[in-house]
């Protein structure tokens, strides 16, 4: 027997679970969007006890018919790959217990590196970091993990605002994490606060500048982000037509490309040894070696040992991508980091003393920061949340695509509205919870595409893991003890992946002359600023009026931050440049079609042919 079509007026339970792999069939898209209990039509609802009994006492409930071999077997290079024959599990489908655990762990490992990296970098050492003590940094990492898990639950379950047509959350397997977009604006803001004397410094006799801890600067970042998060909330209520006009693919691709490219500088500096005082390679003092002279097996900045450590992470990641199984490929960055940690421990560079003295558990608000709003940071952080809105829309589009949900029409627009609203609220709630702003992550979409499991049950398991890791502070201490070269080797791969996502989005364009002009103009200024950060530093005058000077500092920060300039130029040019009557084929008539509408390629991981449509 087979079940009726989802569009049918009646719904029946399939007699063969191995054939349909459903616990229930749902009748309409509207029913699917409800929270789990309401997603089950009354005619097939079973008692809670019978569902629990079936889930935990049968092979179907524990194991199911998923192709675990395809998930775990390594893929040899240059050998034809067999497509994953596992069933596809949609967002609202129940999945076996073991599969939920495996998928939850896989999604967790795919995002953990991206979640902790911004917090590690902004709390670290240097002129554009907070230079905080180990205990405070441990707490900040714990808070970022806890908040990421909590806000992931909001995105996954999708709640309707009572008596309205609006939602909070996308209702998809979307894990949230600390956005990389926070990093450039936060670093610029902290750097300005050190320059202006808001944050303390100490100058040695030889002229070496030591940047002292500045926890109040983090409070200013949190307060400023909370105010600016209302921009994303406002965008979530805009008509879909306006959102599509403001944030087309060309804007999204340019911004992501510039974010990833500009962050590579920080990643490479950490690969060489860190961003602290040792970076200037002083010949005297406490920082001739990195991170300091008294660190275990300290090395000079840019030395061969640091280079080799970072390379061990980077190239292990590439080797796993070459020969690893689907599971290992999805967690390749974490495996590379673990290999690097083993090598660092073997040569005596891994200091575990901070792990020993760290408390067993922590919670939000164990440490607090004085909230304030930093005037010169408002304009840059408005663009941070504008970019987060762009990121969110791109991630939700990809999530719907890999989850078997249409990426156009009322259903998608409702999910986009709910996802944007949840991200905006996350900016406020994460600030109150002492964490940088979180946004939907794109890594999960890749995991869904190759595992064919988009069930929200797996997402809930991932969120629970994030919350647990945030509570157990020994884990945060272990993450903090990782030497800077290993963080650098991992982060350059993550940052380049962000840039690659932007390139992929741009490849969908038709590349008309108009497109090329917008991209060229945006990248000219944005990448130029990334290469020469002081390009605009001395343009604005210095005045005694504090308020006016704050305004000038805000302009300098905006013009000195590459991805903000990319966003401004791409949005403005996209709105004012006229569309062409015909695509410009004069320069490219004989060239093969490398991207844009009509491009067809084969996705080897998914085992299917995909056509890119305009």
Regions found by a protein language model. Give the residues of each.
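Membrane-embedded helical hairpins/re-entrant loop segments and their flanking transmembrane helices
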Residues: 97, 123-169, 380-456
């Amino acid at each position: 027997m087979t079940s009726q079509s989802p569009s049918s007026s009646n719904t029946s339970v399939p007699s063969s679970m191995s054939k349909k792999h459903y616990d229930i069939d749902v009748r309409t898209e509207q029913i699917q969007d409800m929270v789990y209990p309401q997603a089950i039509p009354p005619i097939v609802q079973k008692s809670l006890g019978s569902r629990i009994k079936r889930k935990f006492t049968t092979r179907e409930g524990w194991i199911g018919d998923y192709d675990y071999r395809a998930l775990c077997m390594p893929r040899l290079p240059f050998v034809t790959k067999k497509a994953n024959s596992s069933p596809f599990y949609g967002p609202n489908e129940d999945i076996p217990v073991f599969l939920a655990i495996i998928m939850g762990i896989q999604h967790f490992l795919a995002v953990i590196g991206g979640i902790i990296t911004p917090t590690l970098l902004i709390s670290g050492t240097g002129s554009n970091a907070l230079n905080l003590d180990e205990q405070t940094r441990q707490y900040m990492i714990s808070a970022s993990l806890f908040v990421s898990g909590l806000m992931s639950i909001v995105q996954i379950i999708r709640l309707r605002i009572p008596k309205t047509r609006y939602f909070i959350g996308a209702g998809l397997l979307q894990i949230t994490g600390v956005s990389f977009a926070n990093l450039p604006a936060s670093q610029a803001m902290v750097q300005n606060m050190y320059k202006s004397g808001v944050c303390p410094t100490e100058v040695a006799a030889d002229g070496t500048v030591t940047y002292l801890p500045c926890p109040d600067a983090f409070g200013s970042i949190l307060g400023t982000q909370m105010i600016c998060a209302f921009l994303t909330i406002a965008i979530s209520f805009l008509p879909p037509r306006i959102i599509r006009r403001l944030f087309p693919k060309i804007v999204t691709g340019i911004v992501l490309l510039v974010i990833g490219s500009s962050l590579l500088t920080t990643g490479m500096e950490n690969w060489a040894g860190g961003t602290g005082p040792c970076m200037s390679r002083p010949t005297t003092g406490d920082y001739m070696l990195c991170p300091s002279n008294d660190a275990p097996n300290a090395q000079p900045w840019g030395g061969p040992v640091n280079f080799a450590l970072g390379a061990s992470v980077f190239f292990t990641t590439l080797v796993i991508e070459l020969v690893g199984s689907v599971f290992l490929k999805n967690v390749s960055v974490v495996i590379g980091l673990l290999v690097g940690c083993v090598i660092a421990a073997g040569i005596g560079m891994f200091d575990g003393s901070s792990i020993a003295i760290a408390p067993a558990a922590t919670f939000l608000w164990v440490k607090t920061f004085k909230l304030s709003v930093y005037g010169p940071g408002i304009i840059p952080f408005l663009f941070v949340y504008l970019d987060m809105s762009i990121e969110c829309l791109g991630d939700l589009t990809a999530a719907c695509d890999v989850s078997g949900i249409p990426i156009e029409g009322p259903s998608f627009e409702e999910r986009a509205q709910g996802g944007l609203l949840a991200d905006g609220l996350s900016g406020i709630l994460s600030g109150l919870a002492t964490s940088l702003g979180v946004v939907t992550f794109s890594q999960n979409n890749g995991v869904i595409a190759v595992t064919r499991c988009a069930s929200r049950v797996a997402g809930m398991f991932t969120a629970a893991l994030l919350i647990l890791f945030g509570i157990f502070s020994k884990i945060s201490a272990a993450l903090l003890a990782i030497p800077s070269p290993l963080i650098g080797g991992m982060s350059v791969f993550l940052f380049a992946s962000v840039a690659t996502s932007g390139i992929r989005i741009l490849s969908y364009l038709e590349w008309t002359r108009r497109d090329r002009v917008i991209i060229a103009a945006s990248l000219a200024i944005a990448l130029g600023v990334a290469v020469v950060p002081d390009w605009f530093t001395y343009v604005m005058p210095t005045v005694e009026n504090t308020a006016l000077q704050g305004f000038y500092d805000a302009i300098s920060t905006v013009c000195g931050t590459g991805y903000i300039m990319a966003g401004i130029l791409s949005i403005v040019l996209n709105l004012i440049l006229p569309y062409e009557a015909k695509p410009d084929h004069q320069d490219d008539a004989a060239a093969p079609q490398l991207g844009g509408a009509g491009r067809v390629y084969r996705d080897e991981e998914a085992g299917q042919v995909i056509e890119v449509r305009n």
